[in-house]
C-alpha cells in the first residue's frame, strides 16, 4: 500500500507563486494532501518566511524554498 504524501505549503493571500507551487505538487502526485498555512496570520512565520514564500515542507527536516520545479518536488514526495 502506497503512502499518501502530505506537505505544508507556507503561503499568503495573492501569492501567485504559491499557486504555481501548489500546481507542481498536484502535478507530481494529485493525491498529495496539502496543508496551506497563511504566514500573515502568525508573526513568527511572517518573520521566518516572508522573503521566501512559497515554501514547501515535508516533515521537520525537508523544506523547499522557491524557486523549485517538478524534479525537486518529485524528490521531496518520494523520499
How would you describe each model-predicted region?
Residues 1-28, 35:
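Local sequence-structure signature of Cys/Sec-based thiol-disulfide redox active-site neighborhoods
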Residues 13, 40-41, 68:
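Short beta->alpha linker loops
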Residues 19-22, 46, 70:
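Conserved strand-to-helix beginnings and helix N-cap segments that scaffold or border functional pockets
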Residues 25-30, 56, 77:
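Alpha-helix C-terminal capping segments
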Residues 31-43:
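Thiol-based oxidoreductase modules, predominantly thioredoxin-like and allied folds used
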Residues 43-50:
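N-terminal beta-loop-helix "entrance" segment that forms/cooperates
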Residues 50-56:
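Structural micro-motif
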Residues 60-79:
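Non-catalytic, surface beta->alpha helical segment in thiol-disulfide oxidoreductase systems
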